[in-house]
């Protein structure tokens, strides 16, 4: 499993993720392929990947047939479950060691992605780039000398590189600075958004920082920009923590320990309340207030309590009350061991 769940330190940055998108020269975009054309594409790509010994180290799973392994995939990739338009034809090629994943027929013909803990964008990109170079030796990509890599979505033209950092910003969020920061980052071609929401409200204080532009920038420029922005966010969050008054710190410490007490003893809890308290607990670990926990069980709990994750682990879909009870059980098991 990818190591972001077991971080090496109590970092504010949870994980870094890089994804590159590629289309194959002379083949219609994914959304335009019929069943026969897709099967031809799949056969060709898998054949070429065998030639470079990638598949020996991977699981090859169709989304509609491999639910259990796909659940593990989402856990490894920060639990971002979404619904795919072309579910029947989506293929996951998952490295057995969790080093990378290749998606066939998702947004484009080929998507190569990797996730790892902390602020490690350059290291993660290096892995993806090496794999991309290997594949390109066997497959001719759609490329234009002026536009770069050609994609069905104009937003991905150019490098077709997507970079993301997942970061915990509880103090910036509680002081209502997030909206101001979001607007400022848009001007720099960066998106900041909560990965968990309830209506229009951010929940859980975990944010995704990602690049918007892929055209007109080099891969190095994109990586440098996101790393620079992330470091500024880290500094601003740390400043908020360091500048707490004595009374504010006491109040925060009380909130953290109350949250830990609730989560370790709750019998039934809804998702939003659980994420709120897990954010407090995570902050407590980051600040050294909670000493008998690491971030690993907190990270795992944040993923496993999502409704889709709970339902996917059950034979039948649960009702709301059953979900709340099972969610509380997951949290108790995570935080009491």
Swiss-Prot record:
Enzyme nomenclature, EC number: 2.7.14.1
Keyword Magnesium in record: no
Coiled coil: none
Positions of ATP binding: 15-19, 162-166, 193-198
SUPFAM superfamilies noted in UniProt: Glutamine synthetase/guanido kinase (SSF55931)
Reactions catalysed, as given in the entry: L-arginyl-[protein] + ATP = N(omega)-phospho-L-arginyl-[protein] + ADP + H(+)
PROSITE patterns from the UniProt entry: PHOSPHAGEN_KINASE_C
GO BP annotation list: phosphocreatine biosynthetic process
Residue ranges occupied by any Phosphagen kinase C-terminal domain in the UniProt entry: 12-240
Keywords annotated in UniProt: ATP-binding, Kinase, Nucleotide-binding, Transferase
Pfam family, one: ATP-gua_Ptrans
Function: Catalyzes the specific phosphorylation of arginine residues in proteins.
Family: Belongs to the ATP:guanido phosphotransferase family.
Name of the protein this chain belongs to: Protein-arginine kinase
Species in which this protein is naturally found: Clostridium perfringens (strain 13 / Type A)
